[in-house]
């Protein structure tokens, strides 16, 4: 690599999400009338950008959702699924034009979704990714910034610049 080692090492520990969310996988103000439509749109995006079949994505997300809602509350959901043959985790972020019902624990409809696809064999890293996403989305300031961001590039920048420690320090200071 052309960067001195400390820079790339710091970059790696910064956040897992930055590595698995390409800018092309950020969609803003999507129209979706239901949870199913959201999964269909995610499928189309992963098919167009990563070559993962849309029906494979849809079926995987839907199967996981049947086990229990991936809605976290506060208008956020993290639908996720396992994909046979996938080599490494990949994510997508959708901000919906209007929120959809998601059977979230607080009953609130969802308009911020991070869709995560992981290889069939679960690893510790996948749990770390989900944990980091939950931490990100529990940060009210971060949710507000995602909602207010002008476009996909601005949202992508929020995800890549987010730091776990900064969020917990902000919460502690409240």
What is each residue range found by the language model?
Residues 3-174:
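Cytosolic covalent-transfer regions centered on His/Cys nucleophiles
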